[in-house]
């Protein structure tokens, strides 16, 4: 089998498995199996692959045909121009979440302390620290396995993050100028209807936001006050249909300057608000 034939075979197998971008995935898996790049492929596309390369490529194709996410097979995902290690213990970083990072960067100044709640792979806090100077970063997650991934990503990207295993704010003692969070926000009954890559293979504890999808917003808005400085800012990623509900919850809890920010696709994606210490209401 030549490299060219391998691409065609892979594309056919993945199309039958209803993979949306079958050709691109076939190429990426071939590149991984054979340890080649585009330049090598175009020069050698009609050369025969070794039996070992064929076996490895077929094994990778089988995994993808089972709808295992490509990023879990390859073991990494790009986010904010940086590379992050990923596995089934963490959500795969998505471009939508870059909107949260970009909005946070607009309000973070040198000398500030930033907390990433529900950090997962660590992509949010690590991207913030890579794009700021003299900023202290901390991150929490309830999952020990997720924190292990996040710690590796911090090391690979050359930043220091104070990681803490915590059920939301349970073990958070410090005060922060900015708190960012991409919490679980999918309604429980929606998860089985998501594409298999998400519903079967991504960690449900990082997806499930309870019956209405809003459980973690309520808890974070209520509990963040002990750790968010007066006039500090809280920023959430939200589902595209949750902007009104989350912003109203923040306003009712006494946050000011609450507004919804859209992502590049024009969908509501981030809610941001300022902690007004004069107003203390329970959500």
List the predicted regions and their residue ranges.
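Conserved SAM/SAH cofactor-binding pocket of Class I
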Residues: 95-193, 197, 219
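Short alpha-helix
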Residues: 238-253
């Amino acid at each position: 089998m030549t490299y060219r034939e391998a691409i065609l075979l892979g594309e056919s197998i993945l199309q039958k498995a209803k993979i949306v971008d079958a050709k691109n995935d076939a190429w990426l898996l071939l590149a991984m199996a054979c340890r080649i790049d585009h330049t090598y492929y175009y020069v050698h596309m009609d050369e025969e692959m070794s039996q070992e390369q064929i076996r490895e490529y077929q094994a990778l194709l089988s995994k993808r045909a089972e709808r295992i996410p490509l990023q879990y097979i390859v073991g990494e995902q790009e986010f904010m121009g940086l590379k992050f290690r990923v596995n089934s213990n963490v959500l795969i970083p998505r471009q939508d979440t870059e909107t949260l990072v970009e909005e946070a960067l607009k309000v973070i100044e040198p000398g500030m302390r930033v907390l990433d709640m529900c950090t997962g792979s660590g992509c949010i806090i690590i991207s913030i620290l890579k794009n700021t100077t003299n900023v202290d970063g901390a991150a929490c997650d309830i999952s020990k396995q997720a924190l292990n991934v996040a710690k590796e990503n911090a090391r690979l990207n050359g930043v220091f993050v104070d990681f803490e295993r915590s059920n939301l704010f349970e073990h958070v003692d410090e005060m922060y100028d900015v708190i960012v969070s991409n919490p679980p926000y999918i309604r429980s009954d929606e998860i089985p209807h998501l594409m298999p890559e998400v519903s079967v293979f991504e960690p449900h504890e990082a997806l499930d936001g309870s019956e209405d999808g809003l459980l973690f917003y309520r808890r974070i808005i209520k509990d963040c006050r002990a750790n968010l400085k007066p006039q500090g800012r809280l920023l959430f990623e939200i589902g595209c249909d949750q902007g009104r509900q989350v912003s109203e919850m923040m306003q009712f809890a006494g946050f000011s300057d609450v507004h919804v920010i859209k992502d590049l696709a024009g969908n509501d994606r981030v809610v941001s608000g300022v902690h007004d210490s004069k107003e203390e209401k329970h959500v």
